[in-house]
């Protein structure tokens, strides 16, 4: 970390397989990566570009049990304990895993920071509060073009801020 900033590398976890994702993370670490943001696949990757959306859906088709991803991420943490992990999780994936299991998984995988993405329809912001009550820290996302209102709101939360590219997918 330098002056409060970390370069965070993104890894679309699970594509082409959870095991291949672990090996790719090992390569990232060998090249100097010390901070990875992983995502868990979702059936409704509405914020993702077509490429990531397709990779998530293909991954879930090949490996439908979310336990496979959780186990692989825990194995990754055991292998690369020096690499800080954070996680992006959509509401439907979180609900499928369940809070108790999710909290246990995050503790085992050394994950403290989570980008929680509520579903578009009927978004349940209370789930974000529940994640925080369970000891996790939410990342505050701000679009790359830095809209002033969103930047001010993100700064006011006191949360770590994640600069997001806007999806250009269809």
Label the model's feature ranges.
Residues 37, 114-115, 139-140, 162-164:
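Conserved beta-strand positions in the central sheet of alpha/beta enzyme cores
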Residues 79-119:
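Hydrophobic alpha-helical segments and helix pairs
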Residues 1-3, 29-30, 73-81, 104-108, ...:
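Acidic (Asp/Glu)-rich catalytic clusters
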Residues 154-170:
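Active-site rim beta-loop-alpha module in soluble metabolic enzymes
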Residues 6-21, 84-98, 139-146, 167-170:
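Active-site mouth loops of central-metabolism enzymes
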Residues 34, 112, 159:
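Receiver (REC) domain switch/active-site residues of two-component response regulators
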Residues 18, 42-54, 61-74, 94-100, ...:
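Active-site-adjacent beta->alpha loops and helix N-cap segments on the catalytic face
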Residues 1-81:
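Conserved N-terminal beta1-alpha1 strand-loop-helix module at the mouth
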